[in-house]
């Protein structure tokens, strides 16, 4: 008979729950593992729709904790289909006798934290109440299908199917009139297969999505060979990579090459049939709209090359979101399907569905009858399964109410007010933006080690602090803010579910950076956590990941170049490196006008670049000085920053060059700065600026030049300075 009081209750027997069960046994914890389905596999148990397939190569989408599996299980394809992935899960479960530790067909109806006993009370669909010290949600990110938000769904008398809850026995559409509503991943994967059988297929599309062919075949030989040669290194690189797959990060900007060159590079990645390779072609496609447009146009070109009807091709081409800002899809003949005479595409933007009827669908000015309707309307992703589990923490607060305006977690693993509650691949972790197998193993390892640490050190509870949780929220937001992801209405942002908060759910900073943050937390004595036992308490409050993500990204990029330290370079070498780096940077926003000119400095002419706002003038003026340690840089080297300053402040920015060391030692730069200020003041009206509203600005060494210029003007009766903008000034 199962114990009613255990150390750990785990909800879910997908890949996360299975591995955690194995580790709980190994470390001697008592447990109950509850699974709503009647078999293991999680998302691969529930999602049996035709064409369901993993978009991560099988060389990478697998467990690493059991080395024997690498020899005992051989994948048949590069991108495995759902039946094979489910068989893999079953194979692992049988090999490690996991079936005996899982209670199938058992749902959790609710869970409450008991502050007096420091334990969770778990209520199940069987009527049993289980108490436990630790409660783990291994419920998966894509396990709760989204209900169709369409009028009249209950009226239809034909067959209704939901891709996320496909019948186990399969469906035969031969000779049927079929409607598919939705063109996300499940729609794109299932539509070609349904079209092979259906007499008539009508696809209702609201938003076109990017997709590429899988070019499926055997597992990629180059990675197979790498794994054989040095599996340990390969897997280590995966764990500290950006996505959980050990790909070499690109150092090429999409804006530094011609379109022809860019398309050639993208074509090479396209032929590999791997989404990650395509997305990794350029270093800036996720952070710069113009760079992303290069990739997006390549993808639209591919659609036009396949779909024969230009109007249909245009409808299937995404324009309203950037490549990767919604989950790209991987297909087997999706776009080719729309060349078939019995397949029709309906644009819901011009012909919206008015209602589902008893016999079909009323849309636009038409009514059509169907034998079957397939809802490929996606999932309540990442938070749906957790929130619907009716979890109540301290002081009677439910997780649903706490997350009303967006999920709040620390590391995507825990949440304030819910002691000893853990979420595997929860919101605030890389999860759906990663190779899930790598992320699952990392989370399970972290939870296992934390439970062991608590047991060995006499702690009963662990809970994050409000400071740490808020700090992590800010860090996750900062990471998202430097990308273009927030421009899209995607399920990454919760935008596919009416009423769901619109925030970035997954952590976008990368698998490796996330892992290092988790390691830092542990190495600093569980930074940001409060641990308590009957006789002791520990709280090492603080913030993890305090470096701004864009700065971290730049430093990480520089480290990949394996360059000598800047201070060891000669002036000539440093200047060459600076110019090359500047050329690779994404351009800043558009401004009204950019003109170059020369002005009189303290000892000869100085070049300048003027950035004029798009609004009518005259404008306030900021005289800007570039950074570069007084040795390198120029009036154009901070171009993206100057554009941004101009656009955001509605100010005329005049970036002025100055003489550099060692050829022109101190005080040459400062003298040039003051001379430039006086020239700009004297010529303000001709430049379109306001002489009475002049500020000085600068970055790094340029910040120093700006500050000294202001002092010189004050002390010698020069132009009146309205203000100083000093960005990381050298002092």
Protein language model features and the residues they cover:
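Hydrolases whose catalytic domains are alpha/beta-hydrolase-1, hotdog thioesterase
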Residues: 20, 189-190, 705-709
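A glycine/proline-hinged amphipathic helix-loop "lid/cap" segment
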Residues: 263-270, 282, 540-610
């Amino acid at each position: 008979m199962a114990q009613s009081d255990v150390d750990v209750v785990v909800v879910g027997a997908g890949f996360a729950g299975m591995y955690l069960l194995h580790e709980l046994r190994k470390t001697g914890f008592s447990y109950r593992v509850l699974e709503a389905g009647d078999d293991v596999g999680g998302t691969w148990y529930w999602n049996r729709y035709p064409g369901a397939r993993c978009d991560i190569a099988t060389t990478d989408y697998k467990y690493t904790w059991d080395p024997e599996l690498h020899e005992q299980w051989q994948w048949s394809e590069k991108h495995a289909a759902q039946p094979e992935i489910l068989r893999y899960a079953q194979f692992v479960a049988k090999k490690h006798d996991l079936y005996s530790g899982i209670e199938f067909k058992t749902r959790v109806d609710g869970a409450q934290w008991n502050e007096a006993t420091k334990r969770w009370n778990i209520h199940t669909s069987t009527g049993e109440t289980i108490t436990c010290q630790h409660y783990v949600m291994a419920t998966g990110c894509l396990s709760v299908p989204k209900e169709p938000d369409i009028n009249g769904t209950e009226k239809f008398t034909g067959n209704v199917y939901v891709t996320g809850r496909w019948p186990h026995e399969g469906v035969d559409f031969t000779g049927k009139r079929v409607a598919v509503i939705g063109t996300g991943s499940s729609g794109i994967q299932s539509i070609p297969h349904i079209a092979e059988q259906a007499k008539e297929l009508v696809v209702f599309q609201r938003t076109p999505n990017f997709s590429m062919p899988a070019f499926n075949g055997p597992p990629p030989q180059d990675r197979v060979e790498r794994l054989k040669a040095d599996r340990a290194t390969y897997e280590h690189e995966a764990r500290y990579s950006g996505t959980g797959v050990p790909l070499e990060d690109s150092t090429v900007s999409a804006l530094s090459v011609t379109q022809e060159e860019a398309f050639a590079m993208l074509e090479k990645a396209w032929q590999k049939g791997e989404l990650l390779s395509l997305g990794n072609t350029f270093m800036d496609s996720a952070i710069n709209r113009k760079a992303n447009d290069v990739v997006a146009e390549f993808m639209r070109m591919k659609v036009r090359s396949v779909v024969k009807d230009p109007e249909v091709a245009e409808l299937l081409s995404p324009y309203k979101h950037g490549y990767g800002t919604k989950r790209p899809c991987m297909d087997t003949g999706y776009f080719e399907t729309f060349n078939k005479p019995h397949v029709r595409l309906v644009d819901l933007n011009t012909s919206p569905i008015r209602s589902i009827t008893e016999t079909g669908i009323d849309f636009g000015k038409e009514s059509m009858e169907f034998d079957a309707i397939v809802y490929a309307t996606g999932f309540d992703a990442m938070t749906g399964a957790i929130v619907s589990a009716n979890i109540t923490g301290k002081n009677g607060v439910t997780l649903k109410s706490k997350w009303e305006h967006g999920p709040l977690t620390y590391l995507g693993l825990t949440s304030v007010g819910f002691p000893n509650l853990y979420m595997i691949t929860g919101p605030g972790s890389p999860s759906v933006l990663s190779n899930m197998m790598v992320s699952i193993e990392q989370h399970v390892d972290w939870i296992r080690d934390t439970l062991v640490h608590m047991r060995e050190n006499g702690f009963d509870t662990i809970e994050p602090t409000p400071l740490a949780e808020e700090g992590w929220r800010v860090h996750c937001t900062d990471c998202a803010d430097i990308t273009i992801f927030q421009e899209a209405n995607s399920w990454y942002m919760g935008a596919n579910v009416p009423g769901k908060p619109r925030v970035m759910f997954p952590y976008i900073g990368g698998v490796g950076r996330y892992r290092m943050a988790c390691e830092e937390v542990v190495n600093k004595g569980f930074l940001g956590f409060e641990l308590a036992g009957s006789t002791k308490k520990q709280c090492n409050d603080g913030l993890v990941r305090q470096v701004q993500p864009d700065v971290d990204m730049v430093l990480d990029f520089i480290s990949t170049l394996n360059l000598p330290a800047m201070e060891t370079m000669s002036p000539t070498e440093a200047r060459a490196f600076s110019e090359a780096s500047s050329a690779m940077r994404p351009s800043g926003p558009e401004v009204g006008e950019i003109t170059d000119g020369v002005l009189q400095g303290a000892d000869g002419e100085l070049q300048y670049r003027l950035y004029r706002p798009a609004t009518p003038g005259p404008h306030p003026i900021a005289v800007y000085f570039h950074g570069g340690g007084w040795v390198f840089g120029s009036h154009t080297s901070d171009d993206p920053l100057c554009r941004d300053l101009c656009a955001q402040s509605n100010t005329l920015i005049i970036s002025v060059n100055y003489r550099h060391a060692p050829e022109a030692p101190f005080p040459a730069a400062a003298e040039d700065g003051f001379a430039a200020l006086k020239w700009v003041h004297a010529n303000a009206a001709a430049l379109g600026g306001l002489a009475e509203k002049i500020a000085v600005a600068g970055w790094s060494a340029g910040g120093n030049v700006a500050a000294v210029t202001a002092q010189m003007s004050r002390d010698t009766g020069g132009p009146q300075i309205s203000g100083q903008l000093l960005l990381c000034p050298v002092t």
